Amino acid sequence: MASKVRKVTSRQKKNVKEKDTVKIEETEFDPSLLPLPASSTKQATQRLYRELRLIVHKQDTPSNDLGFYVKLDQLHSIYQWVVQLKNFDPSIPLAQDMARHNVESIELEVRFAPDYPNLPPYIRVLRPRLLRFMNGGGGHVTAGGSVCMELLTLGNSHDRGWYPEYTMEAVLLQVKLALSSLNPPARLDYDWKRDYNAREAMDGYIRSANLHGWVIPPHWTTLFKR
């Protein structure tokens, strides 16, 4: 995996904190109607309701281009999202690969533990398959498709890692920024049509986090390996 994604500045940290004062207009989408997993908690559920409603409100506003889209038709739990990253800078190699193969977006799965927001979200690429780091690829995506960067871990004695104040909008933008990095650039794999699976994604996350000495959140291997 490439070097760490650039740190969030103090000004950016202020911008990624929850914006409870934002007025959300009523829409047909009501996240409270979604079923909850047995391990859900009140704290995580309320935070996720708020986060998701803010994102849906913005993505339903034509003037807003978030650069990503939460697929509501595939949202079967507030604790598990499918997100499309789109509208990459057309000059970067990843965007050029995508255009060449008529790939419209990078599709992610985002999963949340019952300890969220005290623990970070777990994010992995579903499709398309990206070129491995050992073969010249980049973008902070492991060989198994998981996104592994300091922001999505508990850090270590030198790196702070996750902050509970981070919003999911800011996190997804950071993931897109990492995929847009040119050092080295993310590229589509030769076998790009083959989807990643959950087991290889978690195995890749563990290997990469251990390599950097980052602390893996507890219970992730049992929660997200399937």
Residue ranges: model-predicted function:
Residues M1-E104, D115-R226:
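UBC/E2-like fold recognition across ubiquitin and ubiquitin-like conjugation systems
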Residues L108:
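Extended lipid/amphipathic-ligand handling interfaces
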